[in-house]
Amino acid sequence: MRKWLIFLLIAAVAGLSACSTSGNTTVSDDLVLVEGGAFKTSKSSYSDKNVTLSDFYIGKYEVTQKQWMDVMGDNPSGFKGEERPVERVTWYDAIEYCNARSIKENLKPYYTIDKETTDPDNKNENDNIKWTVTINEGANGYRLPTGAEWEYAASGGQKSQNFTYSGSNNPDEVAWYWMNAGEKPLTGDWNWPAIENNRNQTKPVGQQKANELGIYDMSGNVREWCWEWHSHPETPENTWRISKGGGWVSSVNTAEISYPGKFDANGLGPDQGLRVVRSK
């Protein structure tokens, strides 16, 4: 009888643990609810594709260095500052962060990461990692946005005012990019020596104007990883992952909502960060 009681106690504890890992319905206060629907803007690359999205949550800000350190225990960023966006993170780093944060917050991880099996779909000759990453359908944990979700949120969702950039037609109101991310404004054509001499760098999140949904920095500051492969008729399939929004070193056109950004999944750009999403 005693053995059965011990067994039942262990089973009950295991059951509670399983529930705590996947049954947490609390939503972090740094997430914004995005009401789903069809695109209201004409400035998205998905505007004419009859895409309809479900409700989801997205980070009000890019993932900060403090948020990254609290979960991962290190800080790969070149421009240090707790409230600056984390940068120099690969797509694989971003996937691992999503799962680790999910576990930390007692959510079910959205991804299964197989580091021993080379992804057969990955055609990028420069990618020396090529982990196989699959989705756990129905999981409530953190994840990267799809390209469509990213552009939908950046354009203001159902509240869109049809801006070119996320929250404005004037990039200087909403974006940190090569002309305004340094000690003084720059003019003329994109120029790396001028950028370097001007001490351009990332800025603490949330300093520019928010977009229609109250989301900050979806244009500029750092580029943001998305989940799927970049797809374009003039580029090879399954080679780059989508990277959106442009960054502090980028030309202004990359900050446009529709700009088709891409990057090697193992790339460590000084303007490459992320923003998280959760399904509703």
Swiss-Prot record:
Positions of S-diacylglycerol cysteine lipidation: C19
Key words, A-Z: Cell membrane, Chaperone, Lipoprotein, Membrane, Palmitate, Signal
SUPFAM superfamilies: C-type lectin-like (SSF56436)
Its membrane topology: Lipid-anchor
N-palmitoyl cysteine lipid modification positions: C19
Chief location bin: membrane
Single Gene Ontology MF annotation: protein folding chaperone
Keyword Cell membrane set for record: yes
Entries under Gene3D superfamilies matching the protein: paralog of FGE (formylglycine-generating enzyme)
Signal sequence, renumbered to the chain: 1-18
Subcellular location: Cell membrane
Protein name from the UniProt record: Chaperone protein LppX
